[in-house]
Amino acid sequence: MSGPGIEGLAVGLNKGHAATQLPVKQRQNRHKGVASKKTKIVRELVREITGFAPYERRVLEMLRISKDKRALKFLKRRIGTHRRAKGKREELQNVIIAQRKAHK
């Protein structure tokens, strides 16, 4: 009775009417915090025009000379939370990587 191909059993863990499950759509509230295409473009444009804040330039210098931990501590003092500081550090590291790729 416990064969893998049997469906619609009367007893056991797999008992009940055999039915195919519909794919469940992701709920709309799960999109909180995800930037839209338009938002990404606008932020990219603003970054291109305004450049970096003074504290961000200082962090970029720290990251260039491999002072990652010092940069994180500095960012945490400026931004306020550890999690946001980690995100900002990651963002600025990606900027440095992009600059190196563009330079080659």
Swiss-Prot record:
Pfam families: Ribosomal_L36e (PF01158). One of its GO terms (cellular component) is cytosolic large ribosomal subunit. GO terms for molecular function: structural constituent of ribosome. Keywords: Acetylation, Cytoplasm, Ribonucleoprotein, Ribosomal protein. It is found in: Cytoplasm, Cytosol; Cytoplasm. The modification N-acetylserine is found at residue 2. PROSITE patterns: RIBOSOMAL_L36E. GO terms for biological process: cytoplasmic translation. The keyword ATP-binding does not apply. It comes from the Eukaryota. Transmembrane segments: none annotated. Its main location: cytoplasm. InterPro entries: Ribosomal_eL36, Ribosomal_eL36_sf. Component of the large ribosomal subunit. Component of the large ribosomal subunit. PANTHER family: 60S RIBOSOMAL PROTEIN L36. Belongs to the eukaryotic ribosomal protein eL36 family. This is Large ribosomal subunit protein eL36. It comes from Caenorhabditis elegans. The gene is rpl-36.
